[in-house]
Amino acid sequence: MKKILMMLLLSLSISASCFAAGAAGRFSAEEKAADALVAALTGGEATYAQVSKNFSKALKEKLTAENFKTVQDGVKKQIGTIKNTNLVLLNKQYDLQKGYSGVDELVYFGTVSRDKFARIFVSFVEENGAPKVTAFQVSPIEPQKNAPAKK
């Protein structure tokens, strides 16, 4: 009986890992593309040519190299230099009636200063079999200051 249960458990674990392989591959590609974009937005060495190969067709039409440079300068001017960015959330858009919409969102947080942070949002959709960036947003976050407790 123990052998039968062990074989059943082993076969279930193998099949579960096989189903996860497809999602892991897509997530890995999205994470690479988002990391390159985040690096370019936060003052890294990535160029528009390197980053734009992961853009969707519609985003490439809207966001030229000149516009991208303006966005980079705007981020630096309005938010500051963002350091220590970390992926904190992968969100898959799911509708209860329609199911998975094919849109994935990756959210990064970065440190600007001791009490100022930045949230970087990158949205993906699958285009020609590969995940492509459809939108991104960088917004500042400042923690709420709590009043001292009354005694």
Predicted regions: what they are:
Residues 1-4:
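Positively charged n-region of N-terminal signal peptides that target proteins for export
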Residues 7-16:
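Bacterial N-terminal signal peptides
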Residues 19-43:
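Short, low-complexity N-terminal intrinsically disordered segments enriched in polar/charged residues
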Residues 20-23, 46-49, 53, 70, ...:
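Low-complexity, Gly/Pro
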Residues 31-35, 52, 56, 117:
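Residue-level signal for cytosolic alpha-helical hairpin/rod architecture
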Residues 43-44, 106:
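Long beta-sheet-rich domains in secretory-pathway and surface-associated proteins
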Residues 49-99:
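Short solvent-exposed beta->alpha transition segments
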Residues 91-151:
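Exposed beta-sheet edge and beta->alpha loop/turn motif
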